[in-house]
């Protein structure tokens, strides 16, 4: 294989790795957002119950 061909293959591998890394990172961001929403809903449910709200003043204000 010539030097130019090896460099082209190297660039293709770097590009493919970057694309896979970028898309998997965005997928994990969506998962983190869903988990944060679930936690917020759970805390809001707790804050509507007086005993739970009293035992968690940091979250319920």
UniProtKB/Swiss-Prot annotation:
PROSITE patterns documented for this protein: ALPHA_CONOTOXIN
Residues making up the signal peptide according to the UniProt record: 1-21
Keywords for the protein's UniProt record, in alphabetical order: Acetylcholine receptor inhibiting toxin, Amidation, Disulfide bond, Ion channel impairing toxin, Neurotoxin, Postsynaptic neurotoxin, Secreted, Signal, Sulfation, Toxin
Keyword ATP-binding in record: no
Annotated disulfide bonds: 46-52, 47-60
Broad class of where this protein is predominantly found: secreted
The UniProt record lists the keyword Secreted: yes
Tissues where this protein is expressed: Expressed by the venom duct.
One term under GO cellular component: extracellular region
Protein name in the entry: Alpha-conotoxin PnIB
Provenance organism: Conus pennaceus
């Amino acid at each position: 294989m010539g030097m130019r061909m090896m460099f082209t293959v190297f660039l293709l591998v770097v590009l493919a790795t970057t694309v896979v890394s970028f898309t998997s990172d965005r997928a994990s961001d969506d998962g983190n957002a869903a988990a944060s929403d679930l936690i917020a809903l759970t805390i809001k449910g707790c804050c509507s119950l007086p005993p739970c709200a009293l035992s968690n003043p940091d979250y319920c204000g």
